[in-house]
A protein has these predicted regions:
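Non-catalytic, usually N-terminal nucleic-acid engagement modules in DNA/RNA processing proteins
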Residues: 1-30, 113-222, 227
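Catalytic cores of enzyme domains
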Residues: 26-115, 210, 215-431
Length: 433
C-alpha cells in the first residue's frame, strides 16, 4: 500500500520509563518530542538510502490514510517488549526497496557500559551536551533540592491554582472547564527514589529576540513565542541524551521541567510552555546563577536569558558550588521593576532560603494573578494586544473560578487558539536581552 516494490521495514525504537511526577504537560511534550526525534532519525535513514539509489517512505500512519492501511508500529512495539518490562516502547518505521539483511523482531540484549568513576561519567555527559551546543551545565546534590523544598514548602502548599481548559472546538466560543490544583513543593526524591544528583541544563534565548519583543516599530511578539516553544524541544532532546548515557551506565534517571514545582506555564500558540520560573531554583542549586528578586535565575554570562531542564539521577556525580555575592553581585535590592511592571500585581512578600550557607531571596508570586496575564491572556500588557486582541481585563482583588471563567469566555473566537504571551517582569528586567 505504501511502496509497490517494498522489500524491508526498518523500525526505530524508543524505550521510555515514565517519571514518578509526570505532569500533563510533561507527558504530552515528551510524546511530541519523541515523535520529532523518531521522524528526524527516519529522514536521516531515507536520505542515506536515496544516496545509494533506493526508494523509501515513512510516516505511513499519518494524514488521511485509513486505519486498515496503517503500518503496525503499535503491534511491533507489543511484540518486542519483554514480558517483564513495564517500559513503554515506541516504534517508527521506514519502508524501503533496499534488500537489507533481516534482523528479526527480538531485540539484542543491551550491552552494559562498564561502570566509570563519577568524574569520568560527568565528563562524558558534558562532552555529549556540548556537541549539541548546550550553553551551560551544572550539578546539584539531591539533598540541596530537598533542603530548599523544606524551607519554602509552607509558603506554597496552602495555595490553590486554577487550571483552565477549553472544551470547545477551534473557532468556537471559549467553553471553560476549570479544575483546582493544590500546589505542592517537591524534592528530587519525589521524581526518582534514591536520587543522588540533579543535572541542570540551560539554553540561551537569543538576545535580539528578547530586545525586539513588544517594542516599536514592529512590536513583534511572534519570535519570542516561537523561542518559548522551540527551546523546550531542544532542552528535552539534550535531557534525553543525558538520560540515555546514565542508563547505559546502569543508573536510573527522570526528566523534570520544574523540580521543585514553583513555576507554572505561559500561553503559547503551540500549547502552554513552562514559564521563566520553572527550574530556576534548581539552576541556582546547581551553581548556574543567583536568584533574582522576581524569582528567576540570573547567570554571570547569560544573565536571565536562559531556560532550564533537569535530569534527576541516582548516580553520585560531582557537584557545583553555589554562587555567592562575591561571584556575582545583583542589582535587585535597588530595583522595583517587579512591582511596577507587573500588570496584575502578582508579587508578594519575600521568601528566603539558604543553600550551603548562601542565602537567596525572592518575591513569592500569587500564581492565579500571574496566570491571569501570562497563561490565560486576560491582560493586554503581557502579549495579547500585540496580536491584535482587544482584551484587557483588570484582575479582580479575589480571583475565583467564576471570575476566571467569565474572563476567558471573552477570548476572541478565531484567534483564541494562538495566544502569544510573555513574562513582562522578565522583559523589563535589567538582566534580560
Amino acid at each position: 500500500h505504501f511502496l509497490p516494490d517494498a522489500k524491508r521495514a526498518i523500525s526505530l525504537i524508543i524505550r521510555d520509563n515514565n517519571s514518578y511526577l509526570e505532569s500533563d504537560f510533561a507527558f504530552a511534550h515528551k510524546a511530541h518530542v519523541q515523535t520529532y526525534m523518531m521522524q528526524s532519525g527516519a529522514y536521516d535513514i531515507i536520505r542515506e538510502l536515496e544516496r545509494y539509489g533506493y526508494d523509501s517512505i515513512t510516516n505511513c500512519n499519518w494524514g488521511n490514510t485509513p486505519k486498515e492501511y496503517h503500518f503496525p508500529d503499535a503491534k511491533i512495539a507489543e511484540i518486542i517488549r519483554p514480558r517483564d518490562d513495564s517500559s513503554k516502547y515506541i516504534v517508527h518505521t521506514v519502508i524501503t526497496n533496499a534488500n537489507l539483511p533481516i534482523t528479526g523482531l527480538k531485540l539484542a540484549k543491551k550491552i552494559q557500559t562498564p561502570s566509570r568513576k563519577p568524574e569520568e561519567l560527568l565528563k562524558i555527559i558534558k562532552s555529549r551536551l556540548l556537541e549539541f551546543e548546550c550553553n551551560i551545565i551544572g550539578v546539584a546534590p539531591a539533598k540541596r533540592l530537598k533542603d530548599i523544598a523544606d524551607q519554602i514548602r509552607n509558603h506554597y502548599e496552602n495555595e490553590t491554582e486554577f487550571i483552565v481548559k477549553d472544551k470547545a472546538k477551534r473557532f468556537y466560543d471559549f467553553d471553560p472547564e476549570i479544575t483546582r490544583k493544590q500546589r505542592k513543593i517537591y524534592s528530587a526524591e519525589d521524581h526518582l527514589p534514591n536520587a543522588r544528583s540533579v543535572i541542570v541544563i540551560g539554553l540561551k534565548i537569543p538576545s535580539e529576540t528578547i530586545n525586539i519583543t513588544s517594542k516599536t516599530p514592529a512590536e513583534a511578539i511572534g519570535p519570542y513565542a516561537f523561542v518559548q516553544y522551540e527551546i523546550q524541544v531542544r532542552l528535552f532532546i539534550l535531557a534525553w541524551c543525558v538520560k540515555q548515557i546514565l542508563e547505559d551506565h546502569g543508573f536510573k534517571s527522570a526528566i523534570s521541567y520544574d523540580v521543585n514545582g514553583v513555576g507554572s506555564y505561559v500561553g503559547n500558540p503551540r500549547g502552554e510552555q513552562p514559564d521563566i520560573f520553572s527550574n530556576a531554583i534548581a539552576a541556582v542549586a546547581a551553581g548556574l546563577g543567583r536568584l533574582g528578586k522576581c524569582g528567576f535565575a540570573i547567570n554571570p554570562i547569560f544573565k536571565a536569558n536562559l531556560r532550564f531542564i533537569a535530569v534527576i539521577t541516582d548516580s553520585p556525580l560531582p557537584t557545583n558550588k553555589v554562587l555567592t555575592s562575591d561571584d556575582m553581585h545583583l542589582l535587585c535590592e535597588e530595583c522595583s521593576h517587579d512591582r511596577v511592571e507587573c500588570p496584575t500585581n502578582a508579587f508578594n512578600d519575600e521568601i528566603n532560603f539558604s543553600i550551603d550557607g548562601v542565602v537567596s531571596q525572592f518575591r513569592k508570586i500569587e500564581v492565579n494573578r500571574c496566570n491571569w496575564a501570562k497563561r490565560y491572556s486576560l491582560s493586554a500588557e503581557e502579549g495579547n494586544k500585540y496580536m491584535g486582541w482587544e482584551l484587557d481585563l483588570p484582575v479582580p482583588e479575589n480571583i475565583t473560578e467564576n471570575k476566571l471563567a467569565e474572563g476567558v469566555k471573552k477570548h476572541p473566537t478565531i484567534s483564541k487558539y494562538r495566544p502569544c504571551n510573555f513574562e513582562r517582569c522578565f522583559l523589563k528586567c535589567p538582566y534580560s536581552g
